[in-house]
């Protein structure tokens, strides 16, 4: 806005000259000087200059002061520029803008309060009706454990979430509701507050409740948002802070505009809104660091564009710094918590300055990395394509079209035509593009793998806040455009009537239909109220363990879910659960190992290749004679030291670690046969539409299948080379186990291949050990051949990605051709 006057506070520019222009003649309409008469004869004047009356605070006689018409007109244009109102589509009549001016300092009118209450109650009720009844997958188990115990979460700590989670998990007086449900309910309520901020943003922007409700509901009940806001995760609060910053930007802009036209007697001046914005930016960063990608463009716009003439003085800057530090204060909990409340499964040694900085900067993962391993090389274009495809899933074609119209209106409207790049709409577009380009370039997740693709998708929620806001702007743009067409083509009377009817009936009907479709289409897909699968999975891991077992775990699912049941719901208090991931950090010896009195740690850290480190073999040697040791999930990669002295026998979802010198004491076939007969049986979420391959439910089913594959692998290693009755039974048992594995995941390549191997060996043994004239044996061998052919054909057709790594690939193809 190169031609717009500099914004300044009305306190400094108020006119105290009560005699200026008060006696001007009423016939000066055509006079080129800038003094205009406030005489009542000007009511019929057709010129477009608008008289502004400013109340003089020092005038006890309430004398009216006339403001210069040119200044008034320029201020009006400036207002439209800042809010993208001057683009010819989202257009306001002067009288409408005057009404907004009169009400700008009073956001919470009765109608607004009614919409806020409606949003909060409806969203919270629907969310609570569809929540997980207990623990869910991913990081939720760990975050709930840490929040309930008031510990420190994985880097960067999430102190705001854990603090509020601790309050919610203890303040709700109910023994029937699980700890996980209580913290998930907190997320649901916070998600409802995010919806309120989205509504207020759009409402303050276009002055239409229905447009605000459309944006709020479409966002709240989009599949991705719904999924993560009904479980104990940090994303719900992060969405709330993104929406809050959008709201504060619009609010600050409006108050600044109208402070130039009259003295603001309300509490919330633009200066105080700036302080609130600083506090909100800071406290939002104590929940999740990805908010910084929204904070950076927002803070730049606030300090260097919209408030550059107001906020750059020592007093205000000092206050902004003060409120920023207050907002960051929850990070003090990372210092205090380890000293006052040492609990199991709490991360880091944050009680020291070095430990705090290391945790805050996520140095253990890589400060600017989401993934600690070697991520896949995926182009930015591919990632953006995935995002656009996902937008269609989230909002449908109509919702995406409305968002596109809203974005184009901001991008190609008055801003570009007159280079008004300083508007709030421009800031929103820049924030969206900044997040998309910066984060997608930063993301090093191997998204070619389904589970990590799901992790990648959850970071779409922040830009989706902006997309939902532009949806409300888009539908308002359409109706504004239709209004202009009718205004240009009809008489004044008919136009007014038509516009009124459109606004009053058609807009609400369309919005109700869109919102109803969004909720109705996604409700069943997001309803997790009966999903006890993770709860049952955790019990299946823990319930079969012998008394006083030491359970080593590796992997998020097999760690977080059993840990939640053990520490929050006090399941199996006799056992100890140790995460091999946490054992490998240097701080474990200081903060965690003292809490495990019955466990011996033969060094400072679980790392076989550093001084004072120890290997898994050293750890097992120190503890194997004291208690049973089981492993759940995977061993730590890079440490094979134990393999010469220990082996494992699969027992359900875990495996017992046994010294090889004691192997004669165990009959592998009988043990696996017994445990397979009692293999966990619970409701499996096998609805592929509801639980696609990037969901934690699908990953859990894969873990179930892998546990069965481990049992079959143990049998095959021991019995495949043997030629006796027990080995034949072991092969038959392996077939049963692998066929069950395929009921969980029907395209498990390892199972398909080794089923063929089992049938090949069974066929060979039948043919070799019985008389060829035995028809029953021949039929049995023929059946084995058919089964071999079926599974190996399926393996070749479905597992083409194994061709370059499987040395048996060509052999299997030749066998298929021969049979």
From Swiss-Prot:
GO terms for biological process: protein maturation. One of its GO terms (molecular function) is dolichyl-phosphate-mannose-protein mannosyltransferase activity. Residues 1-68 are annotated as: Disordered. Disulfide bonds: none annotated. The keyword Oxidoreductase does not apply. The chain crosses the membrane at residues 113-133, 152-172, 185-205, 210-230, 232-252, 285-305, 316-336, 391-411, 427-447, 459-479, 505-525. Keywords: Endoplasmic reticulum, Glycoprotein, Glycosyltransferase, Membrane, Transferase, Transmembrane, Transmembrane helix. It comes from the Eukaryota. It catalyses: a di-trans,poly-cis-dolichyl beta-D-mannosyl phosphate + L-seryl-[protein] = 3-O-(alpha-D-mannosyl)-L-seryl-[protein] + a di-trans,poly-cis-dolichyl phosphate + H(+); a di-trans,poly-cis-dolichyl beta-D-mannosyl phosphate + L-threonyl-[protein] = 3-O-(alpha-D-mannosyl)-L-threonyl-[protein] + a di-trans,poly-cis-dolichyl phosphate + H(+). One of its GO terms (cellular component) is endoplasmic reticulum membrane. Glycans are attached at residues 18, 38, 70, 349, 531, 686, 693, 783. Its main location: endoplasmic reticulum. It is found in: Endoplasmic reticulum membrane. It is a multi-pass membrane protein. Its EC number is 2.4.1.109. The keyword Amino-acid biosynthesis does not apply. Residues 15-68 have a biased composition (Low complexity). Residues 1-10 have a biased composition (Polar residues). Belongs to the glycosyltransferase 117 (GT117) family. O-mannosyl-transferase that transfers mannosyl residues to the hydroxyl group of serine or threonine residues of proteins. This is Protein O-mannosyl-transferase tmem260. It comes from Dictyostelium discoideum (Social amoeba).
